Design a protein with these regions (language model features):
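Conserved core of the sugar-phosphate nucleotidyltransferase
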Residues: 101, 114-207, 240
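Conserved N-terminal catalytic core of the sugar/cofactor nucleotidyltransferase
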Residues: 33-102, 183-185
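Residue-level signal for inorganic ion chemistry
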Residues: 5, 32, 89, 109, ...
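Hydrophobic packing residues within well-ordered alpha-helices of enzyme cores
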Residues: 14, 39, 60-64, 123, ...
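Short aromatic/hydrophobic "clamp" motif used to bind/position activated sugar donors
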Residues: 105
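N-terminal glycine-rich phosphate-binding loop and ensuing alpha1 helix
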Residues: 1-58
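Short aromatic/basic micro-patch
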Residues: 25, 114, 169, 215-216
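Hydrophobic helical membrane-anchoring modules
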Residues: 213-240
Length: 240
């Protein structure tokens, strides 16, 4: 089982002028290290591939050495789009895999550090049983659609709605084949792996994840991460 960590973002929405958002720190450790440690310490994860902005590869390798992240087997330069970046990582894994029909790959965001061991295990189990695992969390507030005049068109039943999050996990052969088809058909702008697999009519199955499993994209996300992280730390220290 392999984790593919996408860390190709530049941090524009975060206003992170000095560093990409995945390298912003909390308690002295970069966000991507917080994320990687879950996969590094999980007994069912055998290897890790990281897709990163090419100019930051050397800095990432320094962090991996400093924090003893040993399972990283591939560090790959990202592409122009997120889809291309994920393909670059999948291709590196695929070339080294003797049995891609039996390899589970968990695709996760480097800036989504509030995961847990259970979520990783549940993703792997779902792929083994069904062939895919799309992490979701419940929609808490009401979802509406509006027209170009800002007039409400519909109110969607919340019970039917979920947030698609990560990890998004698949059999390596399936997701790699889907990416090859997309390249052949000149499709380069799929928003994520689940959308790509759905487009090619693969069956997708949900795995419930924690509400706090947010992607850190804006300053507000970072402050939420800090608050939740500190709450987790306090609960361990004080038994709250």
């Amino acid at each position: 089982n392999t984790a593919l960590i996408f860390a190709g973002g530049s941090g524009i929405r975060m206003n992170a002028k000095a560093k990409p958002k995945q390298f912003l720190e909390l308690n002295g450790r970069a966000i991507i290290i917080h994320t990687l440690e879950y996969f590094e310490n999980h007994p069912e994860i055998d290897s890790i591939c990281i897709v990163i902005i090419e100019s930051w590869i050397d800095y990432l390798k320094e962090l991996l050495e400093r924090y003893s992240i040993k399972k990283v087997k591939w560090v790959v330069a990202g592409g122009i789009t997120g889809q291309e970046s994920i393909f670059n990582g999948l291709q590196a894994i695929y070339k080294d895999c003797d049995h891609p029909e039996d390899c589970v790959v968990l695709i996760h965001d480097g800036v989504r550090p509030l995961i847990n061991d259970t979520l990783i295990s549940d993703n792997i189990a779902s792929v083994r049983k069904f062939g895919s695992a799309i992490t979701v969390s419940p929609v808490i507030e009401t979802i509406v659609t509006a027209n170009e005049n800002n007039q409400i068109q519909s109110v969607t039943d919340r019970k039917l709605c979920m947030h698609a999050r990560a990890p998004q996990s698949f059999i390596l052969k399936d997701i790699y084949t889907a990416h090859l088809k997309a390249i052949d058909e000149n499709i380069h702008d799929m928003i994520d792996s689940a959308s790509l697999m759905k487009y090619y009519r693969y069956k997708l199955y949900t795995v419930d994840g924690p509400v706090e499993n947010i992607k850190i994209t804006t300053p507000m996300d970072y402050y939420l991460f800090r608050a939740i992280y500190e709450a987790r730390e306090n609960s361990q220290i004080f038994g709250i």
